[in-house]
Amino acid sequence: CPVAAQGRHGDGSWCKYKQMIPLNLPSFNIKTKVQGGRTLVFDFLRRRYVTLTPEEWVRQHFVHFLVEHKGYPAALLGNEVGLKVGGVSRRCDSVLYHRDGGRPRAIVEYKAPSVPITQQVFTQIASYNSVLRADYLFVTNGINHYCCHIDYEAGNVEYLREIPAYPELK
């Protein structure tokens, strides 16, 4: 259960969802509930409960990490952002926008902890970025995190050792 440390949900019910594995991210007080036999988690960016899946577990932890530990403004982040890639509707897992004009500054692709980060995952986020043209790409499965900075003028992609703090973004 994602709230195994407490053993119970905030409403006092026991978690019926399969065990979520610990992530390579800071823990936080995650808000969950059971409704209609499904475990839901509160997404504070979307301001609603969503189905708790392994990928959603990673998303909630990573967004919390960005906001609480790296100083990213929650008001500039969006989850499940729609876009069209080659005429096909897709959803980018998370987007960080620029303060001025709302242009995407970074995009994030999440995978479940059991899903390895492969070239296919980087190809997926690159296809989204062909439309969004963000300066940073983050890929994580909650265990391994990858970040690259794209310099469009120089035509360079720089892989970074760690996720930069918000004030460090170029």
Placement of each model-derived feature along the sequence:
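A short, conserved, highly charged catalytic patch centered on acidic carboxylates
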Residues: 20-136, 143-170
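Hydrophobic alpha-helical context, especially transmembrane and signal-peptide helices
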Residues: 1-3, 38
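Acidic, Ala/Val/Gly-enriched low-complexity intrinsically disordered segments
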Residues: 3-5, 11
